[in-house]
């Protein structure tokens, strides 16, 4: 609600107030529309919410000073050439960049777009101040050796990971932990995401969970009717989504209570994006359980 409150204060008494909210995909756009409808309904007609791709195609249709307030969600994308052109075309009174992952893989800095940070809040500080849910992290160790898995400069090579990590014993270990420690009491009521390596891994994890009487569904680019699957998840008909690629960035479901990090990564950006999916705090959710699957990394370091 920080942005909504700031927009409300900024717009007070300004008849010419107009705001633009930019986001990378339609899922995040839908979330913003819901938030604006709920919290800023009187200003709804003066706030445009657009995807990056739409803005790239149409930004020149507005004058440079048309918007007085611009929000760039998932702002670590802002240094991409086309999006950067859009942002620098406009001359708002106030420009806000929102990101939990200001460290980009290509090392480009967001100060190029937004200037020096006015406010910077570490994840640890945010948890201590109650801005986000506290993460209760549990590490489960495997005997899988990743020391021979190649590194492409940003992260592990997926083809190598598949050979090393798609091991039945490792998958069963994850299922057993969920069955032994997360099926009773408050923990047993929580829904979760299992971050997998690839599409085949999502299917294997879902099959094993269902066999253990824990309702699960694979969720990837191969999923038929993904909107229906997501709706069933939000209606609590599915307890775990076994996902790859589709919900690392921007996806929001405040009730999410368990994150299983089943995909090894050396990317701090990806790791924080995945952790961030469960950090939305609600009136009844104060913490999120993070199950970190720790393999043998050899000389490599974890994010």
Residue spans of the language-model regions?
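Conserved two-lobed SF2 helicase motor
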Residues: 45-58, 232-249
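Inter-Walker segment of RecA-like/P-loop motor cores
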Residues: 27-66
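Conserved interdomain linker/interface between the two RecA-like ATPase lobes of SF2 helicase motors
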Residues: 117-193
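Conserved Walker A/P-loop ATP-binding site and its immediately adjacent core
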Residues: 2, 6, 15-36, 197-200
């Amino acid at each position: 609600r920080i942005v909504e409150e700031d927009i409300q204060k900024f717009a007070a008494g300004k008849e010419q107030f107009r705001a633009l909210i930019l986001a990378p995909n339609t899922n995040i756009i839908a979330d913003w529309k819901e938030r604006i409808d709920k919290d800023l309904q009187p200003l709804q007609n003066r706030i445009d919410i657009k995807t990056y791709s739409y803005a790239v195609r149409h930004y020149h249709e507005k004058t440079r000073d048309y918007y007085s307030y611009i929000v760039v969600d998932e702002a670590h994308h802002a240094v991409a050439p086309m999006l950067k052109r859009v942002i620098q075309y406009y001359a708002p009174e106030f420009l806000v960049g929102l990101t939990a992952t200001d460290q980009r893989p290509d090392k480009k800095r967001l100060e190029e777009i937004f200037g020096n940070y006015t406010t910077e809040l570490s994840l640890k500080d945010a948890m201590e101040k109650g801005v986000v849910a506290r993460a209760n992290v549990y590490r489960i160790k495997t005997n899988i050796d990743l020391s021979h898995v190649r590194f492409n400069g940003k992260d592990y090579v997926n083809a190598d990971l598949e050979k090393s990590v798609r091991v039945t014993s490792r998958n069963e270990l994850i299922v057993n932990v969920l069955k032994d420690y997360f099926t009773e009491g408050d923990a047993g009521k929580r829904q979760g995401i299992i971050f997998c390596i690839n599409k085949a891994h999502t299917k294997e994890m879902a099959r094993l969970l269902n066999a253990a009487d824990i309702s699960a569904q694979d969720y990837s680019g191969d999923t038929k009717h993904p909107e229906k699957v997501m709706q069933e998840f939000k209606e609590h008909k599915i307890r775990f989504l076994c996902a790859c690629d589709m919900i690392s960035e921007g996806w929001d479901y405040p009730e999410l209570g368990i994150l299983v990090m089943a995909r090894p990564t050396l990317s701090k950006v990806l790791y924080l994006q995945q952790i961030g999916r469960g950090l939305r705090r609600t009136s009844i959710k104060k913490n999120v359980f993070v199950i970190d699957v720790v393999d043998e990394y050899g000389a490599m370091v974890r994010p």
